């Protein structure tokens, strides 16, 4: 009977301690790694190009007191406005295809108006890991969809088996000026970067800023919309209730995300001297 060779990693020799220290990964090679596992990284480094990235955006008015609990200083709130978004990303270098949903508050940092990202939900591990590690996107696991149902653009978000958001918009009712669409997508974005240390205190606690600059608008529309948010303790979008729909847009783009820069360090209670805005 023919004998099969031992499976990879199953030989007795592989279980013995290494006799030659030179066979281990050198320290300088460890420093070349950008994430783990080192043999099969959770994501590939950028830049990541998003082709045919499609947005359903609904801006709505909410309760100021509820929003103030979620927006960190030194950011300020002029009006209690929130943008609910569902993004279909069918062709992304390194990440593949996925759909994402989130909420962003309209805020101001000094004289600059932008958005503070409250939370993002998606079901693509590389995009979750890279968003949290390489940048500061507050991503967690969820299942979003963006699709056309007859004459309606529909966006949904499920957390586990439960529906937590449902958005509908009239499909391509009125054209939206491309420059207005560009301004909406390229608004400065602020996020919290928090990395805990081993002794419970944070090792990193920063407010960062990013801004999309490399973008092509391929289509843009506006129209009527409705948004329903459902209570969930671990996906608390409904903590910012919908009081009034302000605007709704449907935008198709190609774009590349810019790296984030630190604008405030909570551990030193200061803005880094070397910080500069990414343009």
Language-model regions: role of each:
Residues 2-3, 12:
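Basic polycationic patches enriched in arginine
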Residues 12-24:
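Short, Lys/Arg-enriched N-terminal segments with co-localized hydrophobic residues
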Residues 77-108:
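Short, structured protein-protein interaction patches enriched in aromatics and acidic/basic residues
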Residues 27-39, 133-279:
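Interaction-surface and assembly-scaffold signal
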Residues 99-112, 116-126:
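Active-site-adjacent structural patch at catalytic or cofactor/ligand-binding sites
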Residues 129:
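Phosphate/adenylate-binding glycine loop and adjacent helical scaffold
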């Amino acid at each position: 009977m023919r004998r099969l060779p031992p499976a990879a990693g199953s030989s007795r020799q592989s279980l013995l301690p290494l006799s030659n220290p030179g066979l281990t990964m050198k320290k300088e090679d460890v420093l070349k790694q950008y994430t783990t596992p080192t043999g099969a990284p959770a994501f590939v480094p950028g830049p990541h190009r998003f082709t045919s990235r499609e947005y359903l955006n609904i801006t709505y008015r909410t309760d100021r007191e509820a929003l103030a609990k979620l927006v960190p200083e030194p950011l300020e709130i002029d009006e209690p406005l929130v943008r609910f978004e569902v993004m279909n990303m069918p062709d992304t270098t390194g990440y593949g295809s996925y759909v994402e949903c989130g909420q962003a508050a309209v805020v101001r940092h000094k004289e600059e108006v932008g958005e503070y990202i409250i939370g993002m939900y998606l079901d693509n591990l590389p995009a979750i890991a890279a968003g949290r590690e390489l940048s500061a996107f507050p991503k967690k696991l969820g299942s979003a969809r963006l699709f056309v149902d007859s004459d309606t653009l529909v966006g949904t978000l499920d957390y586990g088996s439960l529906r937590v958001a449902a958005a509908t918009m009239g499909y391509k009712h009125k054209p939206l000026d491309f420059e207005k669409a560009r301004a909406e997508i390229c608004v400065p974005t602020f996020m919290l970067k928090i990395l805990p240390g081993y002794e419970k205190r944070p090792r990193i606690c920063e407010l960062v800023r990013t801004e999309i600059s490399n973008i092509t608008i391929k289509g843009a529309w506006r129209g009527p919309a409705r948004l329903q948010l459902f209570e969930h303790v671990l996906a608390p979008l409904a903590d910012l209730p919908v009081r009034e729909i302000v605007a709704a847009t449907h935008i198709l783009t190609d774009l590349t995300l810019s790296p984030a820069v630190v604008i405030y360090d909570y551990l030193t209670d200061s803005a880094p001297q070397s910080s500069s805005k990414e343009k």
